[in-house]
């Protein structure tokens, strides 16, 4: 995760130690100063994501890392980032819950929280991984998607993946695409509309505190960023926030498929559980698929929908199934 974030251009991290994600903060506290970045240990998870939002609007690629209880505390600031269209990355390494739960044990019970934890109607992008190589690739993709769609992106890993030790084939600089911040071409002294999308739907940014003065708020706002309750403006913004992701669902969503030809039964999984599931169905001669990227967007045809039986894991309460079928 750390190597992927640095490859993608991370320059600011704010966080609070919590098992099993603390290693992300520990390593970034050592590595960020070497690339001119900043690391801050905040007083809690609430202030951590707020600091990340501030760093992002000021022009830096920014992220935080947490788990279970800390992720719960971040939900309000996550909603602020959605409403303010602030690109950032939130890494959540899942552990047993609820409450303090099982801090050192693996779990995959935060799927619904990642998708629906923020109150109100919204869309969000969530990426998962099943290996160290996947973690690197998905972290780079997470930053790219955050910048492309001007939205927070959640990296939803689990404790086993978070503490996994595997070989990582590091790509050379430039080998993987890295999306840089789209900055406005509007010059100083000219009217700048921070929330007026271009014809292609993308929204250029101006570094906060720079040559343009504008407002950033968690309230519904107009193209200048000032709060409004005007129904037409509110409705237009809501549809924009959702459609900019869901309309691109086919470009965003991806999965890996294994042995699906003529399959009658399909197992769908993600994270560390996907590796075990794949091994079991392979050794028993069945067919399997697992989603490396799940949760959102939803409006994408599921590759398992054509098959008669579909088994989804992990978790007694079938959180993944609710979002897949």
Where on the chain are the PLM-derived regions?
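Thiamine diphosphate
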Residues: 1-116, 118-120, 123, 159, ...
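Conserved thiamine diphosphate
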Residues: 105-159, 179-185
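Short, glycine-/Ser/Thr-/acidic-enriched flexible segments
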Residues: 69-70, 95-96, 131-133, 160-162, ...
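Conformationally flexible catalytic loops at phosphate/diphosphate-handling active centers
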Residues: 153-256
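Short glycine-rich or small-residue beta-strand-to-loop segments that form or flank ligand, phosphate
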Residues: 11-15, 62-66, 125-130, 264-269, ...
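Structural beta-sheet core signal
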Residues: 50, 64, 90-91, 155, ...
């Amino acid at each position: 995760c750390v190597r992927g974030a640095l490859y993608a251009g991370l320059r600011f991290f704010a966080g609070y130690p919590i098992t099993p994600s603390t290693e992300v903060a520990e390593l970034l506290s050592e590595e960020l100063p070497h690339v001119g970045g900043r690391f801050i240990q905040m007083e809690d998870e609430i202030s951590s994501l707020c600091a990340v939002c501030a760093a992002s609007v000021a022009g830096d690629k920014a992220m935080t890392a947490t788990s279970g209880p800390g992720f719960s505390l971040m939900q309000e600031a996550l909603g602020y980032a959605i409403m303010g269209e602030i690109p950032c990355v939130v890494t959540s390494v899942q552990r047993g819950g609820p409450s303090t739960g099982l801090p050192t044990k693996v779990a995959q019970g935060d799927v619904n929280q990642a998708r629906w934890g923020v109150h109100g109607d919204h869309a969000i992008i969530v990426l998962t991984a099943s290996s160290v190589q996947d973690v690197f690739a998905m972290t780079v993709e997470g930053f790219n998607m955050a910048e492309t769609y001007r939205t927070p992106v959640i990296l939803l890993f689990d404790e086993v993946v978070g503490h996994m030790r595997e070989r990582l084939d590091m790509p050379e600089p430039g080998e993987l695409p890295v999306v840089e911040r789209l900055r406005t071409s509007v010059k100083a002294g000219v009217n700048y509309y921070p929330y007026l999308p271009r014809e292609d739907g993308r929204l250029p940014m101006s570094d906060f505190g720079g040559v343009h003065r504008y407002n950033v708020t968690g309230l519904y706002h107009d193209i200048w960023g000032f709060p409004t309750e005007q129904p037409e403006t509110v409705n237009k913004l809501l549809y924009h926030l959702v459609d900019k992701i869901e309309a691109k669902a086919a470009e965003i969503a991806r999965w890996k498929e294994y042995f699906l030809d003529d399959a009658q039964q399909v197992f769908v999984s993600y994270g560390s559980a996907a590796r075990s599931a794949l091994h079991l169905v392979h050794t028993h001669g069945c067919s399997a698929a697992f989603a490396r990227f799940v949760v959102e967007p939803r409006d994408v045809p599921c590759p398992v929908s054509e098959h008669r039986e579909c088994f989804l894991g992990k978790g007694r309460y079938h959180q993944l199934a609710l979002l897949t079928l």
